[in-house]
Amino acid sequence: QKWSGILDLRPKTVYMSFGTFARAHMMPAEYKNTIRNAARAFPDVTFIWKYEKPEHNASQGIPNLIESTWVPQNDLLRDSRLSLFVTHCGQGSTTEANYAGVPLVVVPVIFDQVRNAFQVKKNGLGVILNKAELEKSHAFENAIREVLHNPEYKQRAVAAAAMLNEKPFTAREIFVHNMEFLAKHGPLRQLDHYGRKLTFIQYYLIDVIAVVALSIILVLSIVIY
């Protein structure tokens, strides 16, 4: 009931979470100010901010900015009243958003998040914001405005979710089919990967490394002497 009431407060709702690695309370002050300024710039939009330190009073004085140490993320994403998800683009959060049909503003920080963000942009499911741009209020606000006001992002997100949720086969059916195939045809040499038969030297390219290392040593010896 609490979250349903929050979603009913205004015509649009934006949920912001940057995962467990990039915690909101550890953000530079400039980044936090950018988020607060964005909420002020969209007074008719409710902003839900996953923020781990309530004693910071990060949302003080901004009625449409609601901070919470915990958010039922998957349930929130699957509610049709949610308009936009601002995320670090981790694999889990991105997958949940894609299955729920929610458009994104992604701020990748590390590792696979950059690749995930590229896929989001490539498929037209949202826009990418470089984390350094969080210092600029106008850049963050423009990204939010682009996704909120351009219905094509929502349309593509819903279409992608429809395809993801309509699986031609369940995991159980695939497993049973593969087991029946294996029982009927037995071990298949054609699928036996040759790589698993490589020797230690071949697998780690020790012979190649040795040749390169010796060549470098030889060249250095000639140059030095």
Task: List the predicted regions and their residue ranges.
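Conserved catalytic-core segment of nucleotide-activated headgroup transferases in glycan assembly
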Residues: Q1-G61, V71
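Hydrophobic, well-ordered secondary-structure elements that form the walls
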Residues: I35, F47, L76, V86, ...
